Amino acid sequence: MAKKNKKVVTQGIAHIHSTYQNTIVSFSDLKGNVFAWSSSGAIGYKGTKKKTPYAAGLAAAAAVEKAKEFGLKEVSILVKGVGPGKSTARKQIETSGFTIKDVKDVTPTPHNGTRPPKKILKREK
């Protein structure tokens, strides 16, 4: 069987989706086709450790290593969500050696749409 050649992507988009429970970092080409991704859960964290900023930084570092195998040089960063790991993941991508074109926050905000889910209750011990 012939060895499949990896496609070379020099410009791309880094998508950071940060929720209260997990952080997902994915790299796509300019058309939106994802070629590298990682998340806090995918690198081995479970439960409440997935939502930590440290786990988000490790997930971003793992995604960056996968993206560098495709020859990525220039990145636009899109940040979505309100989770605790979004700034750590963004900083990890910025310090990884890519040329950063721009950083955008694309968190969807409702204009009084549907009713939001009820708040998470924290139990006192």
From Swiss-Prot:
Pfam families (alphabetical): Ribosomal_S11
Domain of life of the source: Bacteria
Annotated region (Disordered), positions in chain: 101-125
PANTHER family reported in the protein's UniProt record: 40S RIBOSOMAL PROTEIN S14/30S RIBOSOMAL PROTEIN S11
Recorded GO CC terms: ribonucleoprotein complex; ribosome
Subunit structure: Part of the 30S ribosomal subunit. Interacts with proteins S7 and S18. Binds to IF-3.
UniProt record similarity statement: Belongs to the universal ribosomal protein uS11 family.
PROSITE patterns: RIBOSOMAL_S11
GO molecular function: rRNA binding; structural constituent of ribosome
Basic residues bias locations: 116-125
Its job: Located on the platform of the 30S subunit, it bridges several disparate RNA helices of the 16S rRNA. Forms part of the Shine-Dalgarno cleft in the 70S ribosome.
One GO BP annotation of this record: translation
SUPFAM superfamilies assigned: Translational machinery components
Name of the encoding gene: rpsK
Protein name: Small ribosomal subunit protein uS11
Stored NCBIfam families: PRK05309.1, uS11_bact
Organism of this sequence: Mycoplasma sp
Keyword vocabulary terms for this entry: Ribonucleoprotein, Ribosomal protein, RNA-binding, rRNA-binding
